[in-house]
Amino acid sequence: MSYLVIAFLFILGTLLGSFLNVVILRYHTGMGLGGRSMCMSCGKKLHAHELIPLFSYLIQRGKCRSCKSSLSIQYPIIEALSGFVVLILALTLSPILGYSMAVFITLFVYALFAFSLLLVISVYDIRHKVIPNALSLAFALISFFSIFISISGPVVPSVLELFSGVFLALPFALLSLGSKERLMGFGDVKLIFGIGYLLGLSSGIMAVLLAFWIGTVVALVLLLFRKFGFNLKTEVPFAPFLSLGTFIVFVTNISVASYIALFV
């Protein structure tokens, strides 16, 4: 993959990230996704040169050109993160190019939809400590239809694949209901349900394990340094860790089965 293509994919990802920021900030606010972007502080309509992903934020030094209020650091972070996600997904799926360009584009767009949803869900969970049902349902539906797709074309899924989401989510559903959502929110359970279909049962288990491991390390670091007012009673959004675990498993193709095989 040439440097020009890599640059194009990253720029494409930052543009996607700019749109995802709009979705995150306007969701459940009564504002539609149409219409021009505006400063969330003074309401000033933004011009094209103020909407260039990453660069506009840097050039304006993180402030609105009109009212000088600080812009959320979320803007450049999500734009950059989306750029890397698009690039990494394309590189992960690039071997398929030797088989079929059409199949590559289909799977790439499919993966892009799925991980864009996960990114929106993750940031929304960080901001509001809740996962909207509509977003988790959309992710579950996209993930479910993935079991009917393969490199060679449409396939008939096995019984295990048909119920992989159910099998993966069931223990956590019992944990959530049994603890009255104190140990795990049911929104996380619905997200795990979709992950089971996107990755399959074995890889899905690995993604959830990674989420718990990464989440534990982050929580311990925050607790140790008392960052952001973090303490033992602080509610930790779990969707970002589930999304990160899912992304790592997707691009590395690791699973519980492959992990166990290393020691057998």
Each model region followed by its residue ranges:
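Alpha-helical transmembrane segments
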Residues: L4-V22, L174-L183, V189, F193-V264
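Hydrophobic alpha-helical transmembrane segments
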Residues: N21-G32, E50-L58, T106-F115, S158-V159, ...
